[in-house]
């Protein structure tokens, strides 16, 4: 049996773990540097029909119906005058149980975690080195070491795993845009609404059957060099 180390417990890492749970040819462990996963109510996520097709292979269709939403259209608006420009019928891309879906990201994480034994996820595991012999030897900041046949880098945009493997620090590229996110209650719309403006746009869409909506805006903004190199500016900051 071959062994796999999954570094990172985001959506991609947890999805892979779900697939491996169904494959007896591999053993695996997930290493997460955080002490726990934040499953508090968070922002929304849109899942294409192709994504749902993959998720249904691990039982996503059994999700509680009240925790997901199936928008039928994307409506495009002129943000300045609030006039509708056009729309796209999303239902034309649906097939069988694979429908364009929106929900809270935290609910998707909860679903992915529900199929993974708790002892398969090792928290507080900060990877610091990888040595390649007959197997891959992983070293962590708490002085533990483990060996695996394969390693999967699923630790996100600031992937320490890829930095170690390629011996190059990952530097984000800033494209003069920032994202603003929020949650809205009781917005009168059952579809995805995209508002287009000059140097900005924002999107509002339902994330469940309880009249909760996700808001995200992309705004063009230039940063000075000191701001671009300050990684703390790129972290998720919540304002209540």
Predicted regions and their residues:
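Glycine-rich FAD pyrophosphate-binding loop
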Residues: 19-41
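Residues at the starts of beta-strands that form the adenosine-phosphate
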Residues: 3, 26-29, 212-215
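Short beta-strand/turn micro-motifs composed of small residues
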Residues: 8, 32, 78, 219
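Conserved Rossmann-like nucleotide-cofactor binding loop
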Residues: 12, 36, 158
């Amino acid at each position: 049996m071959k062994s796999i180390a999954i570094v990172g417990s985001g959506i991609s890492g947890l999805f892979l773990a779900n697939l491996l749970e169904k494959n007896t040819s591999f053993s695996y462990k997930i290493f997460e540097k955080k002490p726990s996963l934040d499953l508090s109510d968070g922002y929304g996520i849109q899942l294409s029909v192709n994504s749902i097709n993959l998720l249904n292979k691990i039982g996503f269709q059994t999700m509680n119906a009240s925790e997901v939403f199936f928008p039928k259209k994307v409506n495009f608006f002129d943000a300045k005058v609030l006039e509708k420009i056009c729309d796209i019928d999303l239902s034309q891309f649906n097939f069988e149980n694979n429908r364009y879906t929106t929900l809270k990201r935290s609910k998707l994480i909860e679903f992915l975690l529900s199929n993974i034994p708790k002892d398969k996820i090792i928290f507080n595991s900060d990877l610091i080195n990888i040595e390649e012999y007959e197997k891959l030897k992983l070293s962590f900041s708490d002085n533990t070491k483990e060996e695996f046949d394969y390693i999967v880098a699923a630790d996100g945009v600031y992937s320490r795993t890829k930095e170690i493997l390629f011996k190059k620090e990952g530097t984000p590229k800033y494209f003069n845009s920032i994202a603003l996110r929020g949650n809205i209650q009781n917005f009168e719309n059952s579809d995805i609404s995209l508002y287009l403006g000059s140097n900005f746009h924002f999107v509002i869409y339902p994330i469940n059957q309880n009249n909760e909506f996700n808001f995200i805006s992309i705004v063009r903004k230039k940063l000075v060099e000191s701001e671009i190199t300050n990684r703390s500016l790129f972290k998720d900051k919540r304002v209540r």
